Amino acid sequence: MKKYKLSNQEVAQILEDFLEGRGSRWAWDDYTLGMSFEDKHLEDIRIRCVGLSKEFPPSNPNEYCNEQGRDVLRGYIKQLRASN
């Protein structure tokens, strides 16, 4: 799999777009399943995001994860935006 070199800000935007329901229809799948990052921290975040639906199962079948999982995403967004 190709290793991507995205910035912290770019990854934060992907997470925020997913959380807010913006972005393309397949952007989340592209991020979680179709990418791999050279930066270990960004790769660790991606891997954690892959498992959020199992770690924090949604009560609504139309959602990816529950509120606790969304809080994890918000935490990553805040962390990534703070670390230019």
Explain the meaning of each model-derived region.
Residues 1-84:
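Acidic, Ser/Pro/Thr-rich low-complexity regulatory regions
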